[in-house]
């Protein structure tokens, strides 16, 4: 699946843009995903990881 973190499963969320006149239009917020070569399930793979997982140390980067 695209736009989903392979570690925590974070995915896009939806909501509304609300103007000053209180008009509403649909909006999608995407997670900040990075492609990283990492040790995942015992193999070195290129996975999509959100920056929160990268910063917290949930990912072991491959060299």
From Swiss-Prot:
Q: Which GO terms describe its molecular function?
A: structural constituent of ribosome
Q: Which gene encodes it?
A: rpmB
Q: Which organism is it from?
A: Syntrophotalea carbinolica (strain DSM 2380 / NBRC 103641 / GraBd1) (Pelobacter carbinolicus)
Disulfide-bonded cysteine pairs: these are none
Q: What is this protein called?
A: Large ribosomal subunit protein bL28
Ribonucleoprotein among the record's keywords? yes
Q: Which HAMAP family match?
A: Ribosomal_bL28
* SUPFAM superfamilies on file: L28p-like
The record's similarity note reads: Belongs to the bacterial ribosomal protein bL28 family.
Listed under GO cellular component are: ribonucleoprotein complex; ribosome
Q: Which domain of life is it from?
A: Bacteria
Q: Provide the alphabetized UniProt keywords.
A: Ribonucleoprotein, Ribosomal protein
Presence of keyword Chloroplast: no
Organism ancestry: Bacteria, Pseudomonadati, Thermodesulfobacteriota, Desulfuromonadia, Desulfuromonadales
GO BP annotation list: translation
